[in-house]
Amino acid sequence: MDLNTKNNNKKVFEIIFENNVLRIEIGEISRQANGSVMLFYKDTVILSVAVCGDKKNSLNFLPLTVNYQEKLYAAGKIPGGFLRREGKPSDQEILCSRLIDRTIRPLFSKNFKNEVQLINMVLSSDPDGNNENIALLGSSLALLISDIPFFEPVSSVCVGKIGDNLIINPTLSQRENSSFFLILAGTKDSLNMVEMSSKEISENNFLESIKFGHEIIKKLCLFQTEIANQIGKTKIKIPLHNVNNLLEVEIKDKYFSEIEMILKNKCNVNNVKKSDILKKLKENVLENYKEKFLNNKKDNFNLLDLENQKLYLNEVEIIFDFLVRTIIRETILKENIRPDGRNSSEIRSITSRIDILPRTHGSALFTRGGTQSLAIVTLGTLRESKIIDDLSDEVDKRFMLHYNFPAFAVGSVGRYLAPSRREIGHGMLAEKALECVLPSENDFPYSIRVVSEILDSNGSSSQATICASSMALMSAGVPLKSLVAGVAMGLIVDDIDKINHYTILSDIEGLEDYQGDIDFKIAGTKVGITALQLDIKIKGITLEIFEKVLEQAKKDRIKILNEMEKVINKSRNEVSKYAPKVKMILIKPEKIRDIIGSGGKIINQIIEKHDNVKIDIMQDGKIYIMHQNMEIVDLTVTYIQNFLKKIKVENVYEVKILRFVKDKMDKTFGAIAEIFPGIEGFIHISKLENYKVDKVEDVLKIGQIILVKCIKINERGQIDLSKKDVFK
């Protein structure tokens, strides 16, 4: 609905979206950008801006950059740290940026190479506003109304399920009770991007939620089209890519047979990946064409400026890549033979080992074909949980999975800096896949960190991470419900505009990922799916294809799990001897201050008395005691429990004599007695008998059990006892 406004340049549009008004304002803010929109949903306000560079570049891909920025003022917060301003993007910001990028990128024309930036600034945030969906819609609409050649609207929704009811855009509280959380994006006709974390959901229930969410997406896409038809700018014309036919024929005649021989050879040469062989061949081809023109004065190559020389060599590279792509795809579609010789449903060979690293708390090495993940588990106290301080309330995150992809994993030289967006995204996917099989905090009161080191990579490294990590967790004694395996599925279609024939690929490798049409990562147990992520490189796929991919992936997942179970099929009964031992006790919240004491004196005394044991006290009365030695943990637990058994003045207790106390003249003047394990009191020599005692040892013996009365407890908690006053 278009609403009239006093500002002639400002256009306002509204739609009812899940019982709330989604309002869009255009024309007042960021007017110098190619396209900009302000979106209002509940209390969330997001500014989405699209900007395009003027010049086409010589790259073989679209230089698209997506930034999703959560300004902390949007939630009424001042940033922490010394500078008190926003710094590097948070994990959540990176994940949302990747989500928008993966959804929108496939919808651009392959011939459009201008630099494009999409900026999404969260200016006001409603905790239940589902900001990622609003930002994606804003990015799509900003592109649609701009002069940037983007023509197909895309929208997204979140779907949850509580009981038998499917819910669109569940609130934070609903997410906690939902059996899954799905983010779905697509056009009015097909799906573009899917992400989900779930509690072992079945394939049928997942497909049901996909269909349910796509109906809402269709309405939002139609809404965007109506706006673009009213106020959209004239689009920049995309220059047609005129293929140099003579050059194409020449390269094909020279190199087609050699490329085909490399791709159809079932054996790798000296274990070198075919992608590396093709890369070397392409480098030689480019060098040959460069030398050809440098040595031939009649040609005009030397007369071209540097930029046009790059464009010419880029043309050579495009033709070479097209030949590789054509051979791979036609061989798969027509002969059902993949670059490594497998058929479409075949999984690469799998080997696994556990306990690779002796001093770590748990480790596993998972190898599938040319991809290898080493997963390491570290257990810590709950105070070592990660603190998440973003637009929502501050929370502690006890399970962390970090994915590292060093350059040597693909035989390259690289810089080792902060984790990349890709590393953060892959780590988060693996983390989601494992969360639902982890024990609760009450059953296993540890913080858990898993690190996946990718040591070799030829596709599906994120899924190898899931397999290695679940095995490492079991080896560390973390009581998982079951093993989790992941597999990456691919798709080759005959026509990206109208799919008539297609082949689904199991366990894709690097070449198939690069030259294929989808990368569909699916993780789960034998019961159901725990996480998935779909990246589509074409305009979309139908629900029918989606269903068949899931069916094949389930069979593959079970095969992989069967291989993993040969190495370890259940969690160990105990954690590693090098891992800290922990116990939890529950006390009344009002007793917490008694344990802590004035200025922390009591808790510090307990810690010092018990070999610097770690003690975490929660507001709800849970106390976690952790130490490398289980005996220390047990002693600390007993001490705290006995400490809370209130020693009262005038009460009589049965005690054990522990030791005598002597003065400077080495004469005994009292005894230390144990009231409860960990709780001690002092008996002065004058309080032993009704007559004068010269030596304590004349009346008492070490280890003797006697009755005493508590006669005093001073402000420091020290207890005075009397033997002679027991019957008074």
UniProtKB/Swiss-Prot annotation:
Pfam families: KH_1, RNase_PH, RNase_PH_C, S1. It catalyses: RNA(n+1) + phosphate = RNA(n) + a ribonucleoside 5'-diphosphate. GO terms for cellular component: cytosol. Its EC number is 2.7.7.8. Its cofactor is Mg(2+). The keyword RNA-binding applies. Residues 580-640 form the KH domain. Mg(2+) binds at D513, D519. It is found in: Cytoplasm. Keywords: Cytoplasm, Magnesium, Metal-binding, Nucleotidyltransferase, RNA-binding, Transferase. Its main location: cytoplasm. The keyword Oxidoreductase does not apply. GO terms for biological process: mRNA catabolic process; RNA processing. One of its GO terms (molecular function) is magnesium ion binding. Residues 650-724 form the S1 motif domain. HAMAP family: PNPase. PANTHER family: POLYRIBONUCLEOTIDE NUCLEOTIDYLTRANSFERASE, POLYRIBONUCLEOTIDE NUCLEOTIDYLTRANSFERASE 1, MITOCHONDRIAL. Involved in mRNA degradation. Catalyzes the phosphorolysis of single-stranded polyribonucleotides processively in the 3'- to 5'-direction. Belongs to the polyribonucleotide nucleotidyltransferase family. This is Polyribonucleotide nucleotidyltransferase. The lineage of its organism: Bacteria, Bacillati, Mycoplasmatota, Mollicutes, Acholeplasmatales. The gene is pnp.
